[in-house]
A protein has these predicted regions:
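N-terminal secretory signal peptides that target proteins for export/translocation
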Residues: 1-5
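Intrinsically disordered, low-complexity segments
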Residues: 6, 19, 29-32
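Feature for soluble, non-membrane regions of globular proteins
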Residues: 27-237
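Bacterial N-terminal signal peptides
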Residues: 9-22
Length: 237
């Protein structure tokens, strides 16, 4: 009998300690509408959708190791440091980009957030044994917007070559038509809530180890051998 009473007292004491612990207090405050909020986990480097050597010989494993493992990772790490302790902590990436676009006092946050998004989108714009032509609705929209697939390809490569300095070349949907646009540095169509279908990174770190100053050759390899048209088509609205 004494043993049972002792066990009961132990359980009651343990329960009381749990109820007043910081974890439970924060959870109760959050659920009751208090200003105290539980901070969401920081951003993490997203996994590549393929192995680092999967895009060879068009993009080498060495380039992918630096581009993904160093550059992309640095943007993620910088973003986490910059938003920590601010009203942007715990917000979705797209919201951070749209709230900081054009804000001079939040330029560093925008640049790193946009580059995290742009790079993640770039990886999913490619696949091993990609390229060729799209089919179905996407092909029809390309032919309607550019006259033919070959004209689209020429314009896309030319736009990427003409982009001065670092930046990105995009295929975006504008209602029932498609457009090729370029953005400088970290800028991104999502900042203007545009619907991007695919992108190619024309920062030098994306191609210089493999192509040196031959950006056109890199862009041509992208459209001929790497574009994931299924992924692009899935983004149509």
């Amino acid at each position: 009998m004494k043993l049972q009473i002792a066990k009961s007292l132990f359980l009651v004491t343990t329960l009381m300690l749990l109820l007043v612990s910081p974890i439970w207090v924060r959870a109760a405050e959050y659920s009751s509408g208090s200003t105290t909020q539980i901070t969401a986990p920081p951003f993490a480097l997203p996994a590549l959708p393929y192995a680092e050597n999967a895009l060879e010989p068009y993009i080498s494993a060495n380039t992918m190791s630096f581009h993904y493992g160093k550059h992309h990772r640095a943007y993620v790490d910088n973003l986490n440091k910059l938003v920590a302790g601010t009203d942007l902590a715990g917000k979705p990436l797209e919201e951070i980009i749209q709230r900081t676009a054009g804000a001079s006092d939040k330029k560093a946050i925008f640049n790193n957030a946009a580059q995290v998004w742009n790079h993640t989108f770039f990886w999913t714009s490619m696949k091993p044994r990609g390229g060729g032509q799209p089919t179905g609705r996407l092909l029809g929209m390309i032919e309607k917007s550019f006259g033919s697939y070959d004209k689209f390809e020429s314009e896309f490569v030319a736009a990427g070559v003409a982009q001065f300095g670092s930046g990105w070349v995009w295929l975006i949907q504008d209602g029932d038509s498609l457009k090729i646009v370029t953005t400088s540095n970290a800028d991104t169509p999502i900042a203007q809530r545009q619907n991007a279908l695919l992108t190619c990174d024309v920062w030098e770190h994306a191609y210089y180890l493999d192509y040196q100053n031959r950006r056109k050759d890199f862009l041509q390899a992208f459209v001929d051998h790497l574009v994931d048209w299924d992924s692009a088509a899935s983004r149509l609205k």
